[in-house]
Amino acid sequence: MIKGSCACGTVRFEIEAARSMTYCHCVNCRKLTAASVATYVHVDKDKFRWLGGEDNINSYESSPGSFRKFCRTCGSMVPGQAPYLPTVSIPAGLFDDDPGVRPRLHVFTSSKAPWHEITDDLPQHPKWVPWFGAEVAGVAYSR
């Protein structure tokens, strides 16, 4: 099992295995993470388990149907799951150990921070990934 937590350690979780990792450059993710790019690990729902602190989580609807979750104590963004996706999205920096996956692609590159240069050879998508429809266009996800 691979464990993770928020900065203060109140919200804790573990996963059996990660499915993928994505770099998201959308404005929402940049503002919510206070970084030029957000990195998410995606895990199948049945491979994710809360270990503690669920009662210490606040939610914010960052776009219609997309709820971001934060630790009430330290403010760290914590794992969240959109009802229309089969996975839980976890900010990669929350893991205590290597989640065992590496980034596979960039999404929303059309809104990337002007000071951020993409220097790798991973696929870049100006908006959303081609294999998902517009109904989930506001959520960072890769398969």
Kindly give the residue locations of the regions a language model identified.
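A short Gly-Trp-Pro
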Residues: M1-R143
